[in-house]
Structures are given as C-alpha cells and as structure tokens.
Amino acid sequence: MATQNGGPTQNAAPSLNVLAQYIKDFSFENPNAPRSLAAPPSQPDVNIQIHVNARPGGNGEFEVELKIDGGASIEGNTLFAFELVYAGVFRILNVPEESLQPVALIECPRLLFPFARQIIADAVRNGGFPPLMIDPVDFAALFQQRMQQEGQRIQA
C-alpha cells in the first residue's frame, strides 16, 4: 500500500527478497594428487573460515558476499584447499535503519549458505575425496563477534 505521494506507508511490512545469487570467485586445489587420494593413515585436520561482507547498492539493494576458505591436511601435507566467494543481491525494504546491518549480515548469508555448502561439497567430492559437509553456521554469533571486534578497534 502506498501513500498519495507514492511512498510506502508507515505500516508496510518488512521484506527481504533475493534478486540474484552467484559464484563470484571459486578455486579448488588438490596439490598432491594422486598421492593425496590414498586412504589417509589418520583423520585429516579440516580448517574452515567464514567471512561475510555487505555493500549497499541503492534502492534498498545490497550485495552480500559469503566467503568460505578452507582445506584439509594430514601431518602438514595439504590434501585439498578451497576458496569460495558466493554472493547474492538482496532487496531489503521497510526495515528500520538500525536493523539493516543485522539483516544484511545475518539473514542474507543464512539464505546463501546452503548453496555455498553444496558447491564446496561437490568440488571436494569431484576432487576425489568424500564430500565435505560443513556444519551449519550461527551467523548471529558471527555478527556479534564482528561487532565486538569493531568496538575493541574503536576503543584502541
């Protein structure tokens, strides 16, 4: 519903729409193949890091990037490594200004994550390893951690 001047009404419901999602950057490395494909003598060490960035694009649109870096190694020897930047363009409307950042950095990556997880699982499987199923991520906790780090940086 709109007012007579064409603007949204005060009671318009908040909305979050996915306009596009895409692989922005992706790499998978299997540097020690075919030796790395043999049954490992022990459980590999798996390391995964997740970062989220959001940039406003105007008209309520935001580009949100979910960056997942990781890999597996045994005794310091790399089995595989990957880097994925999976992004989406979202339209966020009728959300209070103070809530835009949490929506962009919590809810948007939550929608992107299952697709990014599948891309990584498929790449690891296609690299000759069992699929890597990344555990669900608590994006609210990541956001809180980020806010604490930024607060500490400002105080320093």
UniProtKB/Swiss-Prot annotation:
Q: What are the subcellular locations of this protein?
A: Cytoplasm
Q: Name one Pfam family in it.
A: SecB
**Origin, by domain of life?**
Bacteria
Coiled-coil portions: none
GO cellular component entries: cytoplasm
A biological process (GO) annotation for this entry?
protein tetramerization
Q: Does the keyword Flavoprotein apply?
A: no
Query: In Gene Ontology terms, what is one molecular function of this protein?
Result: unfolded protein binding
Question: What keywords tag this UniProt record?
Answer: Chaperone, Cytoplasm, Protein transport, Translocation, Transport
Q: Which NCBIfam families match?
A: PRK05751.1-3, secB
Role description: One of the proteins required for the normal export of preproteins out of the cell cytoplasm. It is a molecular chaperone that binds to a subset of precursor proteins, maintaining them in a translocation-competent state. It also specifically binds to its receptor SecA.
What is stated as this protein's family in its record?
Answer: Belongs to the SecB family.
| Self-association state and partner proteins as the record states | Homotetramer, a dimer of dimers. One homotetramer interacts with 1 SecA dimer.
Can you say what this protein is called? Protein-export protein SecB
